[in-house]
Regions:
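Structural motif
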Residues: 5-10, 120-123, 152-153
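Short, acidic/small-residue loops that bind anionic groups at enzyme active sites
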Residues: 88-103, 143-149
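A generic local structural motif
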Residues: 52-55, 101-105
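N-terminal beta1-alpha1-beta2 submodule of the flavodoxin-like/Rossmannoid cofactor-binding fold
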Residues: 1-68, 74-93, 140, 158-160
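Glycine-rich phosphate/pyrophosphate-binding loop and the adjoining helix
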Residues: 124-162
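Short glycine-rich or small-residue beta-strand-to-loop segments that form or flank ligand, phosphate
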Residues: 64-71, 114-121
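Short, conserved loop/helix-junction motifs that constitute active-site signature segments
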Residues: 106-114
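Hydrophobic anchor at the start of a short beta-strand
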Residues: 2, 20-21, 115, 146-149
Length: 162
């Protein structure tokens, strides 16, 4: 299943659905992760906070290809997208395993194919390097086989990268 997470605005959902099975709009109106770990222990893969991100773990966990469209913020995801990713920690379990000679959490949903990040907005070369490294590490942590990062000068280029 191909899933797109974005912060572009709700009006973009219809356009993005043409190239994805599932679209999640990170509008920034959700409570941040409280670090209670109930999504790991008490209610596996379901957030204890009952809002629209309650099932985010299951939606992102089912994605074979995950595309994240985000505005650059100092070489990182926008706050709304970061909040959504934080709330999806339940895609893994509290147990640990070695992957590639590194310790990582055991995956609840198994391996995935592509973690793609499409970044828009002003960005420096240093921020690009930070973003590439972070996306690669996020992909490994969440069990994706590979990662890609694309930087757009303006949003009119977006359609060709989905």
């Amino acid at each position: 299943m191909k899933t797109v997470v974005h912060d572009l605005g709700k009006e973009q959902n219809e356009n993005l659905l043409a190239s994805a099975d599932r679209v999640v709009f990170a509008d920034g109106r959700y409570a941040p992760c409280q670090g209670c770990f109930r999504c790991w222990t008490k209610h596996p893969a379901a957030c204890a906070m009952k809002d629209e991100l309650h099932q985010a773990c299951r939606v992102l966990g089912a994605a074979d290809d995950l595309t994240i469209i985000t505005e650059n913020l100092y070489g990182s995801y926008s706050p709304a997208v970061k909040n959504l990713l934080d709330r999806s920690i339940g895609t893994s379990t509290p147990f640990s395993t070695y992957r590639g000679r590194q310790m990582h959490h055991t995956l609840r949903y198994g391996r995935h194919d592509l973690w793609k990040v499409i970044v828009y907005g002003e960005i420096t070369e240093a921020e690009k390097a930070t973003f590439r490294y972070m996306a690669e590490r996020n992909a490994i942590n969440d069990g994706f086989e590979r990662s890609e990062v694309r930087f757009l000068e303006n949003l009119s280029e977006l359609e060709g990268w989905l």
